[in-house]
Amino acid sequence: MNRYFSLRDEVLHLLDEKSHGYYKREAIAHMFQVETLCVLLAKERGLDEELCAIIGLLHDVAVPIYSSSFQHATRSSELAKELLGPIFSDEEKKYYFHCN
């Protein structure tokens, strides 16, 4: 789970810089609720829990960062590619980058 904690900290730092007030609080709540559901599904289906937690964490990451839901799936995917960088294998990255 080291990769998860590193990415979580980076995402929270981005939110501190780019998002504010109620919108930021709602985004953080949504992010962690979806992450929790992803981990529960991973446990139930025997999937990689760390990878699923990260998918939940990043699934809508662009919405609070850009303060817009316009093309949020594509924008979140692009932002996730930047955040994930070289720490994930190509096999792992393909699960997140489904919308491209």
Residue spans for each PLM region:
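Metal-dependent phosphohydrolase cores
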Residues: M1-N100
